[in-house]
A protein has these predicted regions:
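Active-site proximal beta-strand in glycosyltransferases
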Residues: 82-84, 98-116
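A short, active-site helix/loop in glycosyltransferases that binds the activated sugar's phosphate group
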Residues: 134-160
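Helix N-cap/beta->alpha junction signal
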Residues: 87-89, 111, 143-145
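Membrane-proximal helix-turn-helix segments that form the acceptor-binding/catalytic region
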Residues: 121-141
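Active-site donor-binding segments of glycosyltransferases and PAPS-dependent sulfotransferases
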Residues: 27, 46-96
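Short, surface-exposed alpha-helical segments at coil->helix boundaries
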Residues: 33-37, 126, 144
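Short, conserved loop/helix-junction motifs that constitute active-site signature segments
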Residues: 97-103, 133-135, 156
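N-terminal subdomain of nucleotide-sugar transferases
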Residues: 1-56, 79-81
Length: 162
């Protein structure tokens, strides 16, 4: 996994690389991380090289330092590479969304983040998700419910969900 000072040496400009960006500790015993570990295991079995990149646990509420760190990562990745970004991280990156969309982004959505909150915070995430999900080219979803929610509530085209 890529952390801090090791990142500079290990990222390449190879456009065939696939990067997997997620917040926090992938070894935590939660459903989300178990799903993400399954993606990495599946890729390994299929001999697909996915390069995991762990971000801060602060997402979806990253600090300025967290955002700067991620921007440094992006600068070291070929823009034609595929970057799978976990929704928890992606939905905390709206301040740099235009930059992110210059890359080949695949959003991994467990469920829209607005569902985790109430009141103004929920409304804010719902607005941002509706605005930004339509700009993403591909999605990976973790359930039929999430797939249906993206199609029906966010108007994501079925062919964008892989």
């Amino acid at each position: 996994m890529l952390h801090g000072h090791h990142m500079k040496k290990r990222l390449s400009k190879n456009k065939s690389d696939i990067y997997f960006v997620y917040p926090g500790n992938i070894n935590a015993k939660t459903g989300g991380y178990i799903y993400e570990k399954n993606i990495l295991e599946y890729a390994k079995i299929r001999d697909i090289n996915i390069r995991p990149i762990a971000l801060s646990e602060n997402y979806p509420f990253p600090t300025n330092k967290d955002i700067k760190y991620f921007l440094k990562i992006l600068d070291k990745i070929d823009p034609h590479s595929k970057i799978i970004i976990d929704g928890l991280a992606l939905e905390g990156m709206y301040s740099i969304f235009k930059k992110i969309l210059t890359y080949n982004v695949i959003a991994l959505i467990h469920h829209p983040l607005y569902l985790e909150f109430k009141g103004q915070r929920s409304k804010k995430f719902l607005r941002l998700e509706k605005e930004n999900f339509k700009k993403i080219n591909k999605f990976i979803v973790t359930s039929k419910n999430t797939k249906n929610l993206l199609i029906n509530e966010f108007k994501v085209l079925k062919n964008k969900i892989i």
